[in-house]
């Protein structure tokens, strides 16, 4: 089963949940998760928790334990917060390049599903009649301890946007589209290195070419160790074809390490 994860402590999450139930024919069944009703349509279920999702390590196991459902992928419907309060629709995989300040474990990465996140970007960009930014975010926050692929899809970046009905509709429609299509999509898969948190060059590449990114390690996470880059490749559900480097947006030692790893593994090295 494909899982859409929502939480009562997040206005954007509840907005998206409401639009999914209203617009896509989800029906309440007899199951409960964390004491909350489960909604199902075909092979997709909507689950709701009462806590912040970024701290929910082992969520996939909790789902199976409480409901008997074995998730194949988890889409976290969430808010995005930023000091700039930039109106945005974003997607990313979770994990920590360094210390676990906001959930997960230190230097631990969740399993990325690049095709799902690329489809999310493309669909949100297509539906975006709000004039908001649509972009990847770099890999950050938890949960990192999940045994199935997952991604966050977010409405940002202040309460005004979190409760925006149209934003909720866009993200709800995008989630359904992604879950219906990601398994049948073939893209060139890359691990991204460099740039800022909102990964502008990686976002542009994903929107304009066949590249699909999994983990993205921004410049603020550099210097990046070889071990973590190898972990990012390993923690990708699809075969990785390339290592992509935002050249000016990366530190020198990380650039050279990435090039060496690409050569060692026989991957394409893309310098942008």
Swiss-Prot record:
GO terms for molecular function: D-aminoacyl-tRNA deacylase activity; zinc ion binding. InterPro entries: Deacylase_DtdA_archaea, DtdA. Pfam families: tRNA_deacylase (PF04414). Binds 2 Zn(2+) ions per subunit. It catalyses: a D-aminoacyl-tRNA + H2O = a tRNA + a D-alpha-amino acid + H(+); glycyl-tRNA(Ala) + H2O = tRNA(Ala) + glycine + H(+). This is D-aminoacyl-tRNA deacylase. It comes from Thermococcus kodakarensis (strain ATCC BAA-918 / JCM 12380 / KOD1). Its EC number is 3.1.1.96. Monomer. The gene is dtdA. It comes from the Archaea.
